[in-house]
Amino acid sequence: AYIVVPGIRTAENMKSYLQKNNIEILANTENVQVVRNKKTDIWQMIFYNAGEFTHKDMTVKVDKGCALIIKKIDKDKIKLHIADPAQTQSNITVKIDAPKRSGTINCDFSNSDIYAGRTQTFDIRLK
């Protein structure tokens, strides 16, 4: 698994960052890679195909491969950043299940033109 950390310019900076022990690798398989920043509660996920990932009381399901960044805003709202690195220019459906609540969003990449696959941002309301 790997992480993207803005502002880290040297190996020494990265080593110092990792020693804070805020990062946990939750999955590193041929189907999905998931890392979570425990301090900020930001999740980064790479799905190589349709699939799902469950950790404790949260499940994320996607119907196509994609890259996700998930930030829980409050108990009923999640900020989702999604990209289609394969540039398939199609729709990707993301469903998030949490205790007694869930939310689904259809992310449309069909009119992306030269920016095919670029990151889009959505707010998901859990009901």
Can you say where each PLM-predicted feature lies in the sequence?
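Terminal accessory/anchoring regions of large secretory-pathway or extracellular enzymes
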Residues: 1-127
